[in-house]
Amino acid sequence: MKEIVIWPAYFDLKRTKNEGRKVPKSFGVLNPKLKDIVSIIEKMGHEYSIDNKKSYPKEPWEICGYLKVTIDEKTSKLDFLKELCKRMK
């Protein structure tokens, strides 16, 4: 198992790749919220921890929080993010 960090900015349709979006626009969602991501990860059955008091490094003035999620070694971070996006829509 490996641990990955997930920021809501990774899914934000309004952001460019340079601004931190990690998934293709076709997978993106508008204004992703940490609580929505948490509920999906809970349904998927993954272990996670939340840090609500951190700001995304590209926007240090905005506190949005992040998740640390435990996933299978064989699963890539991008594949996991895409699966989350499918479930968010």
From Swiss-Prot:
Its main location: cytoplasm. GO terms for cellular component: signal recognition particle. It is found in: Cytoplasm. The keyword Ribonucleoprotein applies. It holds the Pfam family SRP19. GO terms for molecular function: 7S RNA binding. It comes from the Archaea. Keywords: Cytoplasm, Ribonucleoprotein, RNA-binding, Signal recognition particle. One of its GO terms (biological process) is SRP-dependent cotranslational protein targeting to membrane, signal sequence recognition. Belongs to the SRP19 family. Part of the signal recognition particle protein translocation system, which is composed of SRP and FtsY. Archaeal SRP consists of a 7S RNA molecule of 300 nucleotides and two protein subunits: SRP54 and SRP19. Involved in targeting and insertion of nascent membrane proteins into the cytoplasmic membrane. Binds directly to 7S RNA and mediates binding of the 54 kDa subunit of the SRP. This is Signal recognition particle 19 kDa protein. It comes from Methanococcus vannielii (strain ATCC 35089 / DSM 1224 / JCM 13029 / OCM 148 / SB).
